[in-house]
Amino acid sequence: MSWTVMPTFETHERAHEEFSWELPDEFNPAVDFLRKHDDTSRTALRYEDPDSGLETYSFDDLDERSDRLAAALADRGVEAGDRVGVVVPQKPQNPITHLANWKLGAVSVPLTVLFGRDALQYRLEDSDATAVVVDPSVREAIEEIRDDCPSLEIVIELGDADTVTGDADAFDELLAAAEPGIDVYDATPETPTAIMYTSGSTGPPKGVRHSHALWLGRAAAAYNYFDHGLEPGAATLWTPADWAWGAALGGTLFAAWHHGCTVVGWPRDGFDPEDAYALMERHDVTTAFMPPTALRLLMAVDDPEQAYDLSLETLASAGEPLTSEVVDWVEETFADVAINEFYGQTELNLVVGNSANWFETQPGSMGKPFPGYEVRVLDPETRTELPTGEVGELAVKPGDRRVFFDEYWKRPEKTAEKRTDDGWFLTDDLVYRDDDGYLWFVSRADDVILTSGYRVGPMEVEEAILHHPEAEQAGVVGVPDETRGEAIKAYVQPATDDYDSDRLRTEIRELVRDRLAEYEYPKHIAFVDELPTTSTGKIQRRSLRE
C-alpha cells in the first residue's frame, strides 16, 4: 500500500487527537502522484475529447509525457524557480504541464481559459512568467499581450505544426522531439510549487505563493470530505469546475492521484445538467466535487436516479454555503449518497468541512475543523476569542506551517497582515460556532463577491467598466441570486446625460467579458446620477448593498 498523508480514523474526535502532519523530508509532487503507486499502469485520467472521443492515460503515460515536456522546457532555458503559466482547460496537457514544471523545479501559475486579455496580462506580468502553455481558445489574447509581458519568452500552444500559428511552439511537436528520462529536481515540502491568484476588494488580484506541501494539505482534506472513499483503482472522480481553481486542481485532480484514483477530464463551455448526468453514467463516477451553482442546475432534471444509471457515492461542495433545499434534494433524490460541504481559501488550504462518515452533516454549515487545524472565532477589533454563538472573524492555525501559503507574491506587507504574531491566520470571513462545534458562514468581512463558486474582487470589475468612454464612475457589489448564490451588480454613473441605457448595458457586459472573465461580467447594471463615496472619494459599497 502506497503512503498517503491522511490515515483512516474511526471518529472525528480521534482524528483530531492523533493526526499530525508527518511530511516526508523529500517530496516532489510529480513523483508522488505518478510513481509511488503499486500499479502505475492503472488508468489515471479518462479524457473525453470533443472531437476525437475518449482517451485514457495511465500513470506511466502521464509520467512519460511530462518527462518529455520537462526536457523540452529545459532545452528552451526554463530553470528551477522560473514561473510557467498554464492556461489550459480540463485537458491532459493541463496536469502534464504542472508535472513537467515540478520535475524541473519550476513554479506553476494556474490560469483559467475564461480570462480575457487584461486578466491574463496582469497575472503573467505580475508573476514574471518565463513561459506559458496555452489552449488555442486564448491564442488571440496571448498574441495581443505577449509584447507587454517583458519576462515572457516562450509560448507553447496545444496542437501540432499544422494548427499552431504565429511565434508559438507546437505542444505536440515539442513532445515528439524530446526524450523522456530526465533527472527529477530534488524537492522538499518547502520547494515553491505554484502562484495562484486571488481577488481582493481593495486592490488588484494578489499572487499567492505556495510550496509543495500545499498538495498534501489538499489531499488530506479531500480524503475527509470525500468520506474516506478514495480507494486506488476503485474511485473515479469528476468535477465540472475549472482545473485552474484550487479546489478542483488540488482538492480533486491531484488529491485523487495522490491516492491512486482515476479522474475524468471533460472540457466544456458552460454546464448542461443532462450532459453532466450522462457523463457520470458513462464513466461510473463515484465521487464528484460540485460547486453549489452546478448542484442547483442538476436539480432541474426530473428523476435523475431513474433516468441515469449512476454510481455516485459522495458529493462534495464548496465556494458558497449550501442551502437546506439543495441538501434535502440530494438526500431525497440519491439513495445513500452523502453530500459534504467544505471550506477553504487559496492562501490557507481546505481547513473546515463535513464528513458524513464521522458526524451528521448540518445543511448550510461549513462543518467542523479538519484534522491538522485549530480554529478560533475572533473579535475583529481586539483579536480576542469570542464565545459560542457570537459572530467574529475565523482564524486558523495549521499543525504544520508549510501546508499554508508562503507569501503574497511581491507584497510583504499584505503577507504580514494575514497572520497574527502568535501564528493564527486570518480569513476575513465572519462566522460563528454553535454548541455542537459546527461552524456557520455569515459573510465576508470585505467586499469580495461569491458568484457561482468564484471569488470576484469588485475593484477589478469596476476598473474594466471604466474602460468604456461613457462610464464616469462605477461601483460593484454582490446581490442574492437563486442560481449563482450571488450575482454581480454594477452601479454606473454615466459620463453624460445623453446615453442609450440598453445599448450601454450591453456594451459594458461585453467589455467586462472580453477584458476579465465570463463569470465576472455584471448580470445587473443600474445607472445612477451619483455614487456614494467616502470623504476621500472611495466608493461606499456598503451603501450600494443597502
Give the location of each predicted region.
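Gly/Ser/Thr-rich phosphate-binding loop
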Residues: D172-L175, H258, V285-M290, M299-Q362, ...
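Conserved AMP-binding/adenylate-forming core of the ANL superfamily
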Residues: S41-L99, G116-Q121, A170-E173
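Conserved AMP-binding/adenylation subdomain of ANL enzymes
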Residues: L216-T239, W243-T286, V301, F370
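Structural core segment of the AMP-binding/adenylate-forming
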Residues: D75-R76, L99, K103-E173, T496, ...
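AMP-binding/adenylate-forming catalytic core of the ANL superfamily
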Residues: F115, Q121-Y122, T130-D135, A288, ...
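Conserved ATP/PPi-binding loop(s) of AMP-dependent carboxylate-activating enzymes
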Residues: P369-G372, T384-K418, V456
